[in-house]
């Protein structure tokens, strides 16, 4: 398997940093990186140009753990140009934690001044590619580190789609050189809800541009699989982890955004990702501390 260089070590294992589980995260001895929601870091970047980093997150950074700010509000796929103050906040987050890269989503979250409150899929059209290309360029102008963008989970497709998701993402990285955050749980959710083979869908994606991968849980409801980030990892997502990691070494991280389980269950999920990727566990110290 060919090794490749990237912003993060290719065999790193990480987790989404959340204040509710920061104690467990602090005990992970082999933690390669963590991702923090950029909008959760307070700061008045319009005045001071600075953000406040929580003490627990700063302690991880001081230990040498890479921290990646992950934005959710830029609306890169929105028709309006990205707001300068939002880009400045993302850049300030990167500076505050000495980030090796930052990330956002292939999505829009507002239109006509209205906030959707969640990530919405971009129509896979040439026009949308032009919009994304322009907004990515505007964003990167303010950044001193690479930008990666994430594939999102969607429950519908736009009727005027001109590309498959793999074709769309491939064209986007070809045009812009942007990196990808490959969300393996979203690959599974989108394939399952459309009656497609997730392994076949995974193999069509531009793997050589992946900066790191998300792994998360979900559940079945109303005949649909929902990528919730609040449920245990399904075996099917771990199977995608195993398949991708075997041929494309890339950093992997657990995403959990609520309904946090007991520490032992969280450690089990991290161990499951490590085992699927045939990597050493990062939970040895945490388990010893809690024994």
Model-predicted segments: where are they?
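Boundary/entry segment of secreted carbohydrate-active catalytic domains
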Residues: 2-27
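Active-site beta-loop-alpha junctions enriched in small/polar residues
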Residues: 16-20, 37-41, 72-75, 106-107, ...
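Catalytic domains of carbohydrate-active enzymes, especially glycoside hydrolases
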Residues: 19-43, 96-97
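Distinct, well-ordered alpha-helical segments
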Residues: 24-27, 83, 158-174, 190-204, ...
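Acidic (Asp/Glu)-rich catalytic clusters
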Residues: 24-30, 48-69, 85-100, 137-142, ...
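Conserved, mostly hydrophobic/aromatic
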Residues: 34, 102, 147, 183, ...
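Gly/Pro-rich active-site loop or hairpin
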Residues: 45-50, 119-129, 190-249
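Active-site acidic/histidine proton-transfer and metal-coordination neighborhood
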Residues: 83-180
């Amino acid at each position: 398997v060919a090794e490749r260089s990237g912003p993060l070590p290719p065999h790193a294992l990480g987790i989404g940093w959340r204040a509710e589980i920061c104690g467990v995260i602090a005990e992970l001895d082999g933690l390669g990186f963590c991702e923090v929601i950029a909008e959760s870091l307070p700061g008045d970047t319009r005045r001071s140009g600075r953000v406040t980093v929580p003490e627990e997150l700063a302690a991880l950074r001081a230990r040498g753990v890479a921290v990646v700010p992950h934005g959710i509000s830029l609306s890169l796929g929105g028709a309006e140009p990205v707001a300068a103050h939002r880009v400045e906040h993302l850049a300030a987050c990167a500076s505050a934690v000495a980030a090796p890269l930052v990330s956002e989503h292939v999505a829009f979250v507002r239109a006509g001044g209205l906030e959707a409150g969640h990530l919405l899929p971009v129509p896979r059209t040439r026009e949308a590619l032009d919009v994304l290309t322009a907004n990515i360029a505007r964003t990167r102008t303010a950044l001193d580190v690479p930008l990666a963008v994430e594939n999102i989970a969607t429950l519908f497709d736009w009727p005027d789609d001109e590309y498959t998701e793999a074709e769309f993402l491939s064209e986007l990285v070809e045009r812009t050189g942007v990196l990808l955050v490959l969300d393996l749980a979203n690959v599974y959710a989108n394939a399952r809800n459309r009656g497609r083979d997730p392994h076949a869908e995974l193999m069509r994606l531009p793997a050589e541009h992946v900066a790191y991968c998300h792994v998360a849980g979900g559940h079945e409801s109303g005949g649909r699989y929902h990528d919730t980030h609040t449920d245990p990892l399904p075996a099917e997502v771990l199977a995608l982890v195993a398949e991708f990691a075997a041929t494309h070494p890339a950093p992997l991280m657990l995403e959990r955004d609520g309904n946090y389980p007991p520490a032992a269950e969280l450690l089990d999920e991290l161990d499951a990702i490590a085992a699927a990727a045939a990597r050493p566990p990062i939970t040895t110290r945490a388990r010893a501390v809690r024994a």
